[in-house]
Amino acid sequence: MSERDKLYHVLLDRLYAKLPKKDLASETQTLPTLSIINVGNTTIIRNFSEYCDRIRREDKICMRYLLKELAAAGSISENGQLMIQGKFSNAIVNTFMDRFLKTYVQCSTCKSLDTVLVKDKKIWYIQCLACGAKNPVKPL
């Protein structure tokens, strides 16, 4: 190797040493599956609060979206369960939650789920914690 190549590799090593280390835990983030049961004419999502905490969204925002899409009434119990009036299949609830993830959680630039929802005046934004992008979304 020439002197120039050695200098190049030394500078490259210094650059990599100064770069922040990637957090592999946030890249391979897996979401819990929704635990959905039907009791009579009521659909209960047992791990709703845990799911909302994992995607960094308030329970009320997720509940508002899901109930609006299902055209149903519902409430969150003290132990974090979402109780929806009406009988809905797992596939329907999961479809709407996947749509919520793609619209209000996933970064449109880098596809990361490591985001926060920010309201600036009357405009809602998804701010990505991985790449720093800030994208407007439809208000909830």
UniProtKB/Swiss-Prot annotation:
Key words of the record: Initiation factor, Protein biosynthesis
Keyword ATP-binding carried by entry: no
UniProt GO molecular function: translation initiation factor activity
Keyword Transmembrane helix on entry: no
UniProt-listed Pfam families: eIF-5_eIF-2B
Subunit record text: Heterotrimer composed of an alpha, a beta and a gamma chain.
Protein task: eIF-2 functions in the early steps of protein synthesis by forming a ternary complex with GTP and initiator tRNA.
Family named by the database record: Belongs to the eIF-2-beta/eIF-5 family.
Name of the molecule in the record: Translation initiation factor 2 subunit beta
Organism for this UniProt entry: Metallosphaera sedula (strain ATCC 51363 / DSM 5348 / JCM 9185 / NBRC 15509 / TH2)
Encoding gene, per UniProt annotation: eif2b
